[in-house]
Each structure stands twice: as C-alpha cells, then as structure tokens.
Amino acid sequence: MNFKYIVAVSFLIASAYARSVQNDEQSLSQRDVLEEESLREIRGIGGKILSGLKTALKGAAKELASTYLHRKRTAEEHEVMKRLEAVMRDLDSLDYPEEASERETRGFNQDEIANLFTKKEKRILGPVLGLVGNALGGLIKKIG
C-alpha cells in the first residue's frame, strides 16, 4: 500500500510540475510576443521620426540653395563658391587617386608625399567646414 501511495503522490507532483513548466512556457511566449510588438512599434516610430528629419533637411537644403540662386551674390559668397568649386575638384582628384598621385608625386620621397596629402586634406576640410558653418549660421538666423 505504501508503494502505491508513493507512486500516486509522485505522479501528482510530476503532473503539477509539468503544468507549471507549460504555464511558464506560455507566459514566456506571451511576453516574447508583447516584446516583439513593442519593438515593432518603437521601430515604426523611429522610422517615422527619421523620415521626418530627412524631409526637413531636404527642405532646408532646397531653401538654402534657392536663397543663393535667386539673389545677387556678395563678394564673400562669390569667394565661398570659388572655394567650393576648388573643393569639388580636389574631391574629384581623390576619386581617381592613381592619376592624381602620378601627376603630383613624380620625384617626391615618401615624407613629401605624406605632407602633400595632409595639406590636400586640410585644403578640402577647411572650406567644407566653413561652408557648413555658414549655412547653419544662416539657418539659425532665419529661424531666430
């Protein structure tokens, strides 16, 4: 009789444990589903915010371009445009480094070559940063 009692109690404990494991799995899967749904919502909101920012930046760029296109340029703006054209030429030469390096580096040693490219980077970055700063300053003045 004791053996039957032990087997019955063991069976009840095993079935209760199996039910608790099954309930845990269901609650975990429900939590996973809820987490996935919330992540999808967050990604959707983030995507909408990014697309709004892209649209705003495109609009600001168009406004800035139209401002410079439809009015007379000052001497300073003309100088900025010349620098921008020079930067674009330098960037084009960076797209084809073999040709540019062959033309510019004939007869130089490695240190002179490194100095040449460092100067070129400074020549490119300086006007670009200046243009970006001027554009942002103009936008801030318009907004303010």
Swiss-Prot record:
Source domain of life is Eukaryota
User: A GO term (biological process) for this protein?
Assistant: killing of cells of another organism
Q: Which InterPro entries does the entry link to?
A: Bombinin
Let me know which tissues express this protein, per UniProt.
Expressed by the skin glands.
**Keyword vocabulary terms for this entry:** Amidation, Amphibian defense peptide, Antibiotic, Antimicrobial, Cleavage on pair of basic residues, Cytolysis, Fungicide, Hemolysis, Secreted, Signal
Tell me where it mainly resides.
secreted
Cleaved signal peptide residues: 1-18
GO CC terms, sorted: extracellular region
Q: What does this protein do?
A: Maximin-3 shows antibacterial activity against both Gram-positive and Gram-negative bacteria. It also shows antimicrobial activity against the fungus C.albicans, but not against A.flavus nor P.uticale. It has little hemolytic activity. It possess a significant cytotoxicity against tumor cell lines. It possess a significant anti-HIV activity. It shows high spermicidal activity.
* Protein's name in the database: Maximins 3/H3 type 3
- Give the organism the record lists: Bombina maxima (Giant fire-bellied toad)
